[in-house]
Structures are given as structure tokens and as C-alpha cells.
Amino acid sequence: MTSPTIASPGEAEAGATGAERARGPRRGAGGGPGRLRLALSTHWYAWAMIAPVVLVITAIIGWPLVRGVYLSLTDADEANVERTIGVNSIPATYEFIGLDNYVDILGDDAFWDRLGWTVVWTVACVAITFAIGLTLANMLNRQFRGRTAYRMALILPWAIPAFVSVFAWRMLYNERNGLLNSLLEGRGIDGIAWLSDPTWAKAAVIAVNVWLGVPFMLIAMLGALQSIPAEQYEAAEMDGASAWQRFRFITLPGVRSVSMTVVLLSTIWTFNMFPVIFLLTRGGPAGSTDILVTEAFRLAFTASPRDFANSAAWGVLILLLLVLFAISYRRALRKQGEVW
Amino acid sequence: MATDDTTRATTTTTTVTRRRGAPRQRRRGERSRAASIGLHATLLVAAAIAVFPPLWLLVTSFKPKTDTFTRSLVSGFTLDNYDHVINDTEFLTWFGNSVVIVLATTVIGVFISSTTGYALSRFRFPGMRPLMWTLLLTQMFPMAVLIVPLYNLMSRYGLLNQPVGLVVTYLTIAVPFCAWMMKSFFDTIPVAIDESGRVDGLNPFGVFWRLIMPLAKPGLAVTAFYSFVTAWAEVAFATAFMTGERNLTLAGGLQTFVNQHTQDWHLMTAAAVLIAVPAILVFGYAQRHLQSGLTAGATKA
């Protein structure tokens, strides 16, 4: 009988114990072909089901990742990678140069400038988006006329591809004849160089990213708010809790676990947010809005000559930063007793 | 019935209090007039900000070139921009490229992430825990770390400028999240259904395909939506991998209207509207399921 173990969802959720137990047969000394065949006959359904995903992930994430790390240790650029010109293919001539790229990058102010701005960008975007999302979700989480209409209008930015909206904003921000400046000038205020003044450009990209990010927060928080049982609010009201107290002691703890997840997700997304900055300012003026990912992209694809090795090194550093962040985030959550 | 009773009960309480001469108490959930005005005002402002940029894109797309930056809502209504974009540029080719890539990504992505989600939800097998961790970790992979090596690999195997190259790339972005979401979704479907199917003689694939998949429609809608959005709106890989006018996807194509050399804002707006409409339609269809799907995924992640 080759039946796979059917686990109840709850058990599968616990994962650890199940996997440990299932791994049992293979752990025996030597294993042996018999045990392998047994494992195969028990688990082949499951393995067949996950095979495509494992294949795709290994081929397109695992292998490139290894190659990326290797490239970052070489001096590969446009001129010496393997390439085809006409019918001739020229073999790669780049060489292994050890950690030189990393030493260069970490010794350069440009990296630390970009890192500083990336942190400011991420924190500002996530904090503002979260605050607005939670406020609006609280407003929508009650009965009144027009609720559905408001909800539809507020999530519209989510429905439109980000690159389209970014172009819409670029048109509004346009320095010479964009709508924003035309409104300002109509009131006798000088137009603002939205995308070519370093400070305004930073504010402008953050504003656009917040605009793009609020709908996701709103829907996630609305879901979280609706899962808080109404009895809690009734009980609090009976005890004479004010609106602020109800928000502070029922709503906030109630949305906590969802908040943790969406804040983590949106931090990672914002940190890696490429299209907004690339399409709005191209990292300019003079690199002042370049975050780490747009800089890595610029090095490899728009700079001349294209510098693949350095770009790969930036990529690896970005990944390391994210891993560090995720680990410390988990630690912080654990310390607060959150099981995550 | 139950709600009726509650309302009636509350009404009685209010009448009782009023009879005693105390100031009229508000029913639960009821707001003062000022609070109500404040609520609507804030929501109106927020909704206006949310709707305005796309709306402006739409109205501008109907203005002739000379009036692109005028402040009036309608000036010299014309469909010339659309006519030009569709007939005189490669827009339809880009649109076709994007549709092919998006459809392939969505169909394959939904299918393989639901089989994986199902296996993770129902079976315990060696390699399950590492797989779950990998799925979680790949979600936070920056494209910056993969784009250069992928570019080199694709160039070696002649996949640059090929839709296939982008499809597999997009799968890696969409699948980890979708698999995770489908797992949480399958977790909510009782195992008893699987068991009854097995008793009736279906093998696990049959159970999955004939019993569970039909029940998982809302989850499938969410994952399909996510794959669609990922592929339709992706910029970095599309910009890097697809060059040459006929190979671009919509994300690359839109950039050709406004760049260092050309400033065809009027054409850009028309193209942008044509790109946004299918996305809005798909979104409108999926959004009913979005909230439940998201929270199921979020709280269990």
C-alpha cells in the first residue's frame, strides 16, 4: 500500500515534528537502497507535486545566485564576458580577483550615501504608508453610506500597474508645464523643481511610493480589523472606555500579528522598489535618489561600460543586508513573545 | 433575526434613558454630526488623491498634442492619440508580447504553485521544511542579486529577447508567494474531503484535481491575480532582457514615448490608458476575493 501520510492541516502547520518523523527512514546508518525505495514509494506523490517548483527555483534562483556570487569575485564587464557578435562567439576572459570589488565598494562614500538614503526611503515609506493605511482602514471599518464607493476609489492605485501610475505622476510633477506647478503659479507661488532638486526629488519619490502602497495596507488592515470580535468593543464600552482607549487597547493589539507581517513584507518590497525610482528620476539628480537596487541596475545595464562584476557585488551586499534585517526582525519579535 | 433582536433591545434602552431625562445617548456605532462630517471629509480627500493621477491620465489622453498640459478637464476632444498609438507605433506588438508572457506565467504559475501548496498542506515528506523555508526566503530576494547572473545565463543560452526567458523569470517571482498562499488556503479545506475521496478510490492526484481544486476557486483567483499583476507590471527584468523595438513588453514600450530624446506625453497617456484598462478589469474581478485571501495568507505566514 503506497499511501502517503495525510496530515491534518494543523499538524502540517507544525511542520517540524512531521518532517522529522518522516525523515526517519533515511537517517538510519547507511540508508541503503531498500530504505530509499521505501521512502520513494511512500512520498512520490508529494515529491511529484513539488517537483516543478523545486526545479524552477533551483534553475532560476539557486544557480544564478551561485553564479552571481562568483561574478562578484571577478572583474567581469561588458568587454570581457562571453558574447556573440554575428556568428563568432567570443569566450569569456574575465578573471577571479577575490574580494577586491567588495573592498572598493565598502571603501567608497557612494555606497554609504546610497545606503543612508535607502534606509531613510524605506523607513519613511513604510511608516507613512502604514499610518495612512491603518487610519483609513479604521474609518472604513464601520457602517455608513458610500462605504463601498470609498473603498473602490481608495484601492484604485493598486489596480493600475505601477509603471503606468509613475508616468502619470511624472506628468503632474513636470517642471515646466506639469499640473502641480501650474496650480502653484496660478496662486503666484514659484514653481518647484519637483524632480531636479535633490530634496524635492526625494520627497516626490516617497510621495509616489506611499500613494502606490496605501491600498495594500488598507486592505490588509481592514481584514485584520474585521477579525476583531465586536464583543470586545461592547465590553470596553460598558466599562466606560473612551474611543482612544478602545483604539489603544483593543484595536492595536488586535491588528498586531497582521501588522507584523505586512510591515515586514512592505519593508522588503520598499527596500527593493525599483520601478518608482527608475522611472521617476532614474536615480537623479546626480544620484541623489538612487537606492541600492537602482544603483546595481544602473551599473550593469545603463552605465557605460557596463560593469557586471560590481553590480553583482552590490546585489550580494543588498541580499546580505536583507538577511540581516529579517533575522533581527525575527529576534525582536521573539523577544516580545510573538510566535512567528 | 438575531440582529433584529439586538437592534430592538438597543432601541428600548435608549428610550428608557431618554424617559429618565438624561441627555440622549448615541446608539453603538452611531456618530455625532461633527464626527460624521470629519469622516466623510477625510475619506473624500483621500479618495480624490487616490483617483486623481489616473483620472488625469485618462482626460489628458483625449486632448490633442498642443493641449496636453492645459489645466482644463476637456479641451479639443480627440481620439487621435489612440489612433496614432495603435496604428503608427509598435504598441500592438508590445501588447501581444505582454499578453503571451502574462498568460503563460499565470497559467503555469497557478498550476505549479497549487500542486506545491497542496503537497505542503496535506503531506509530510522529507524535504518539506527546507522547501517551506526556501519559499519564504526567495520572497525577499532582491532582483538586484539575480539580474546580472540571469542576464549572462540568458545571453549564453540565447534566451534574451525571447518571451520564454521572461516567463521563467517571472515564475520565480510569483511562485514562492503563490505557493505559500495556496498552502494557507488548502489548510482551510477540511481533510475529511480528501479522505472520503481516497476511500472512494481516487489517487492523491485525483483528489487534488477533482475534489480540492474546484473548492479552491477563491484561492486560485487570488494567486492568478498576483501572477498577472507581477508579470503585467514588472519593469526591471523586462527593461534589461528585452531590447529592440519589436521585442519590448508594455513596461518597456511605455518608456519609449518619454525619454531623453522624445517627449510624446500625449501618446504616452493614450498608451498608459490602454495598458491600465485590462489590469483594472482583472483587478475588479479578483478584488472580491482579495481581502480574505490576503488575510488568510498574512496571518498564517
Regions found by a protein language model. Give the residues of each.
Chain A
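A structural signal for multi-pass alpha-helical bundles of membrane permease subunits
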Residues: T42-W340
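Transmembrane alpha-helical segments of polytopic membrane transport and secretion proteins
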Residues: M1-I50, R145-R147, R330-W340
